[in-house]
Amino acid sequence: MKNLLVFIFVFSLCMFDHVSGAGIRIGNELKFQKLLWMRCYSKDDVLGPKIIPIGGHFVTYFSVNIWRTTRFMCTLKQGPNYRHYQNFTAFKLFGMEDHGDVWDWRARENEIYLKKKEGGKFIKNPVNMHKVYDWIN
């Protein structure tokens, strides 16, 4: 019985490790007082639509599933009548050891930037701030 309790305790710790938190941050760094429209979704959740003011940001945290298939898609819109837009994968995992951490997106005048925030040894493919997408007219 004692061995069973030890096994259950260790197994529980391993399971908590595999469902650790992750998140998305979307910041509005547009010029000329432009608002940023955003909507994100996964298989189970819909976030938004929300309007992010200049200099503002939207942050959400969530748990990744045990199968490591958690993925969020987002749409961002800006400009007159929100005619400039981009649809993209805002969060995904790259394997069993990847915990996801926070994917930090920044909407700027001509492009959208990403920085995957480093959260220790478990982050796979950490990146510095770099351009990922152009706006679609």
From Swiss-Prot:
Q: Which positions make up the signal peptide?
A: 1-21
Where can this protein be found?
Secreted
Q: Share an example GO biological-process annotation for this protein.
A: rejection of self pollen
Record keyword Calcium present: no
Q: Which residues are glycosylated?
A: N87
UniProt KW Endoplasmic reticulum keyword: no
Q: Which UniProt keywords apply?
A: Glycoprotein, Secreted, Self-incompatibility, Signal
* GO annotations of cellular component type: extracellular region
Q: List the InterPro entries.
A: Self-incomp_S1
Give the protein family: Belongs to the plant self-incompatibility (S1) protein family.
Name assigned to this protein: S-protein homolog 16
